[in-house]
Amino acid sequence: SFLIFSCSENKVSIDIPTLSKYNIISDYSDVADTLNVYLNKSVGISLEISDKQKKRSIILVEKTDLNKDFISIDYKDSLITISANNKRNLYYATYDFIEKFLNVNWLSNDFTYYEDLKSINFPKNYSYYFEPPVLTRTVHSKLFYKDSVFADKLKVTNEAFPRYVPSARVHTFHRFLPYEVFYDKNPEYYALRNGKRLPTQLCLTNTDVLKIVKDSVNSFFNKFPNSDVISVSQDDNTQYCQCDKCSKIDNQEGSPAGTMIHFVNAVAESFPNKTISTLAYQYTRKPPKVKPIENVLITLCSIECNRSVPIELGCKDFSSDLKGWSQLTDNIRIWDYTTQFTNFLAPFPNWGTIKPNINLFVDNNAKWIFEQHSNNDSELFELRSYIMAKLLWNPNLDFQTLLNEFNNKYYGNGGKYISEYVNSIQNQIDNTSFFLFLYGDPSQGFDSFLSPENLLNYDILFNKALSSVELDSEYYKRILRSKISIDYAVLESYRKNFSDLYQLTKTENDIKSINPKLIRRLNAFSKTCNDNDITLMNEMGFTVSDYIVNYRKALKTAIKENLASFKDVTLLTVPKKYANEDPKVLTDGALGGNSFYSNWLGFEGNNLNAVVDLGELKEIKSLSMNFLQVTNHIVFFPVQVEFFYSDDNLKWKSLGKVSNKSDLSPKSKVNDIQTFSINAGELKARYIKVIADNMSKAPIWHHGADLPSWIFADELIIE
């Protein structure tokens, strides 16, 4: 056994017989055992763990004299030294060594890539030292939350809010002063809006509120003594207090963050050995003049930003706010967003923003970054989790290298096609001015990056990937699972029914039926989700099962002989914002999905009042219309829907009223679709009127209390 020097004499190659004579020196046997596990799997050896250094040793050492996070790997004179400032980072350093020199890659928590090595190779007199610029790194992914060892391998946290009080992590005002307990007796504790106290936010200049919050924070810390961070933060709405005292401070500070920071500073002063976290989010995002005190953690959120371009280019107001906060404090936690919360499984081409955004945060001294991904399965879930974790650890890594490395190892020969898909869809959105929204819908991209022609191209790439690997191999199964995002986008394209490539129905011999290609796609989507335990469509709890059931119902509707199809619609009330405010949406044959962007006509604070002209007298037996509910976005079912008929569009007769079957409450299903239908018996009419009664305002218990509520309607069916 001997050391083999390369011809250039710049590298040292240690063969397996030589390596087997090494021992491992470490105060931590578990870290040494971990190294042995991967030595055994990569080169087939396990080394003696000892406290005696030999001529050839691997030394795992903790160096506590340096008061900062670091890892280092050194090779000199046949000694391999792996060191870090604490045990956690020593694990990270060991994993770094395993990855760099044993060519191991942890790609998901159920797949590790190995190579069959004959030796390990070092640059001569190798010395590597690295200080991670981000000290707390979190990717919101169940891959890490359910497997703490896998999280350690990728050097991220295994929980979303490390060190936080478990029940007080974000949007906590309502936890400190519950509406049910305080509002009736003390409405002055809450936000004044248009002369009315609403339980949407707290009045931050009320001294009793400050005392109650301090007492609550103290109780939480007593209950959870091992936690050292608690969130004292606004609830998830923009209805902050505008009383004279609060408004005066906000005006002086130049931002509603003024009252927030004054309030949170006052809380933090009472807990000098704890960290009080608060949000710079929506209305509090703009920094005030007052500085947060030392133990206040600012969680700065980028929720408004366009996800198709880097924040520094496409969201300059956020970039400016980030720089403003970084001048006030070094204690910044970034809360960034990397998925479409309304459609987890949809293609979401934010690939070109991941690295630039992390670099922006790091350049502005963010030491804590939380990348809020989907947690649950979403488009190319494993790939995204991997790339974000890698870049949080080392923002200087090359995105394309990471992309290709992962895909080639995780998908085998199919990997190059997955990389081509990622680059292709990113190029498509780069060539448009498309605003990629966190709460958007695939249908918004049907005239750009998700056009029928582009969908066909993506489909071809995934099919090439499938064809390039062995049928039913693990590679094949992974590619098939990853294809569901294209399957989902294609299904939504069929639903929209706007392209010859993806037609919803076909007609033969005057008989309308569903396109058989659609049926095959729907069945494949359902099977892939079922086989891989993919259960959620969005953050509102809308399940894959809900989606399949509603889609099949929509297909039954699509083949009905609808007398209203493509008939003229006159609106007697004014819609707002969605579906281009086009009344034809109600009769266009395209069926609304689970998102309000998906072919729904919206009315904010007012009723739907629509008249359909059938062109001539028609025999009518039944009428129905669908309505959408998304409670967290103040979208509710109508209180009731009334159907009318007329021969002349002047004199109207009511067919009856249909009440909402699912009364709104805090326990209502967040995302749902309800059909309001009525039997007409047998009558003849030319004109049909539908009036859907809006609740007008969100109820007092809702986070949007007193704001105008929405109703969303689609597809009047007249049989």
Can you name each region flagged by the protein language model?
Residues 250-267, 294-312, 392-398:
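Acidic, His- and aromatic-enriched active-site or binding-groove loops in soluble protein domains
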Residues 14-17, 26, 30-34, 38, ...:
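Feature activates predominantly on carbohydrate-active enzymes
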Residues 39, 45-71, 82:
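Short, well-ordered secondary-structure micro-motifs within conserved domains or adaptor modules
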Residues 592-656, 672-719:
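Aromatic, loop-rich ligand-recognition surfaces of beta-strand-rich domains
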Residues 50-52, 392-579, 583:
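Catalytic domains of carbohydrate-active enzymes that cleave complex glycans
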Residues 208-209, 219, 317-416, 420:
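Structured mid-domain segments that build the active-site/substrate or prosthetic-cofactor binding neighborhood
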Residues 277-304, 345-352, 378-385:
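Substrate-binding cleft/loops of secretory-pathway carbohydrate-active enzymes
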